Amino acid sequence: LTTALLMHAKEKDSSIKKEDSQQVAEYTVVHNFKENDASSKWVTVNDNVMGGRSKGGFVIKKDRLIFSGATNTNGGGFSSIRTKPQNLDFQNKQGVIIKFKGDGRTYKFDARMGNSSVAHRVDFKTKANPKDWQTVKIDFASLSPSWRGMALSGRRFELNAANIRSIGFMIYDKKDGPFELKVDWIKAY
């Protein structure tokens, strides 16, 4: 992973809490969207790949990733963004912490190994019109493998954090309408 994408400096941040309310002492910044070429590292994949009608995409504005659009369940009903495959440094990491503002809808965090089309995902909920930023802690062990929406099982589909090459976000909550997820940063722990 390039220095622009992954800063190896470790910091302390009292605003990030574990579920048991203890501080996360150290973390590694994976994305903070301040790089000049941050948008070139992401791609959009919407349900139009299967004939759907959802619209979605992303912009980097004021050093934040904004994933927005509108889902249409008359078709696939999803929109997603993810990083292009690259060498992410998740070896010896347990998961990620994401600082975001949402819209009350449920999103999915997505991780992929190599150039695989198998996605490992987990849902996270957002508050509608939040005044403050939210954080969510996602343990890699909580991600479930799937391929084109079908659940997969077996050892060959287990997630190996050291082999994660792409991360992203998806909205597929079986609801029509506009969506917007603002991401301030993504950090690994």
Give the label of every model feature segment.
Residues L1-A4:
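Bacterial N-terminal signal peptides
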Residues M7-Y189:
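Beta-rich carbohydrate-recognition modules and glycan-binding surfaces
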